[in-house]
Amino acid sequence: MGEKQRQKAISYLNEDRLYFASLFILIPEIEALDLYEKLNSRNAVALKICAKILKDENLFAHVAGLVSENSSMTYSALKWMLKTGSADDSLNDDYDEVMDAVASLLIKTYKDNSVLPMVADMIFKRNRKGYLVHDLVWCFFQARTSYCLKLIAGYLRSPNRRDVELARQLLHFIPDETGEGANLQKQYQNFLAWLQENNQFLYFTGENLQFTSDPKPCRVDLDAKYLYKSISPYNHKPLQSLTQAEQDHLQQFHELRREDEKLLSKYSRRMHDRNLRSWNQWMQYPVDKQIEIAKAGLGGIR
């Protein structure tokens, strides 16, 4: 290759508008033409990340000493890789492995929830093609935010049957949201109503498709809902300490049947929002009296 063509190749690789997929595809040419030392810092860091993920010792040997990256440079490269590379997901197995790891690093290590729509899009695109989505779904839910649920619920309204089926599968733990007979828009509206009622009482379990065919990645803490105490979605702990009276109520609450726990927590949540004074009075009663009132549906709250 002449020097003019070589310079043209270097200029193309270091172009601001370059997509990560192009860099990835051109790795063999970069090696054949020995262009590693001509790469800009973005590309050098990106290839170093690829080498670590793929355990490619040859590639790592070429790029390890090119740049001394810091956390900011690594984050910037990861964001570029996902932002420009997600559209080319399913390019090949190695590429998908890299994209999975990049998504995981951005979500788990850098706590960047802005990438969640891109990751959700990758999940559903892969599923349409019949590819496995287990790893991506796992890292997606590691964000441990109800934003994940909202993004998935959006696919309930998709015209693509596979999108709807996957959304139902991932949201099946939510009652009344995934019934086959329900209108798709109605399912979505039901989900939004459920989320509004339960959002501050949700915690994430870590269950995923890698270990079970019926994962429940998220649950409602009925204790927290009954006491109207927000909890951390990360560690399932109340954000405020419980009073002795609240602890005593919980002890009685735990003696109820599961169905009555659900009824009481739902009634408590709705009464708290509609009439705080009545809720405070209701919380002074013994749990059996609370159940009696809840089942009677006093005040139109059920």
Task: Tell me the role of every PLM-derived stretch.
Residues 110-111, 144:
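Ankyrin-repeat interhelical turn detector
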Residues 65, 105-107:
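Intrinsically disordered, low-complexity boundary segments flanking structured domains
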Residues 107-108, 141:
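C-terminal helix/turn sub-motif of individual leucine-rich repeats
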